[in-house]
Amino acid sequence: RRHQNNRMSNHILKRPTLGANVLLLLVVAFIVVALNTRFWGIVFDSPGLAGLHGSGVIAAIAAALFALTLLMVLPLSLRWTFKPGLTLVLILAAGAAYFIGDYGAVIDRHALASVYETDAREAGEWLNLRMLLSIGALGLLPAAFVWWARVDWQQPTREIFSRLKLALLAFALLGVAALGFGKDVASLLRNHMELRHIANPFALLAANLSYLDHARNDNRPLAKVGLDARRGAALPPGDRPLVLVLAIGESMRAASLDLNGYARDTDFDLHPLPVVNFGKVSSCGTNTATSLPCMFSDLGRRGYDDATAKHRENVLDVLV
């Protein structure tokens, strides 16, 4: 009986053997379905997608997203990069899905700049149990399956040929989607501009490429401003340096401050202080990489451009 139980256990835990293309397609399908819940929520809630025609538009969007994701992971499908590459894609896509779903974030160049240019302390504030569980369930568990499954590798030439067929399949899906429902998809994207920034993991790749391209062209000379600035009479005389401390919370919503008329007592610690409240200030953006430099720029909210501001002095440079 013990021998029989061992055989049953081995049978239950038997590692599946899959072709490389099959495993690749399973991973792509999982990403498209499970790691794009907010994307699909917006699509399904969009008006005008009822009936047979609407189903066709949704199918075209699914085909296009599947094809783009497949084309993204195909370069990682060589034998020695196959499982590590899929693991990396799954974990990164799971992380992006968490921030897109739980924080309503969009994945663009500015969001990545906020991530890449932060410090360890601020990054640690994002870590929580919900985040770890989400990435574990949607990233690490599928990655564990990828490593657990055996891959039935064919001869190198046959593997290359099979990947080429997958690439042709992806381009065919894109072509059919564009020819059949291209105008409808374009209209949906115009009405919901955020879709292109939450299509996971395509948005992640596009944002990284944009960030790298922006950084590569980051060699313009620094434009000086406020050259006529002088030390004012109100400042104390002498050579001792004047220290100015700025505590900035650029992500605070002005509408949620009771100083601005909010019903709840949200900033009671400020009440005893001689606060000068500017209640009609608007941010240049919803991300740190844009809103924080804009606070100190002379370009103004309407004229602000992060590429220009990066090569232009601001009020802090003038004060120093």
Could you say what each language-model-derived stretch is?
Residues 178-243, 251-320:
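Active-site-proximal alpha/beta segments of enzymes that process anionic O-linked groups
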Residues 248:
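Generic enzyme active-site microenvironment
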Residues 1-9:
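Short, Lys/Arg-enriched N-terminal segments with co-localized hydrophobic residues
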Residues 3-4, 154-155, 222, 313:
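Residue-identity detector for glutamine
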Residues 8-199:
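Transmembrane and membrane-interface helices of multi-pass
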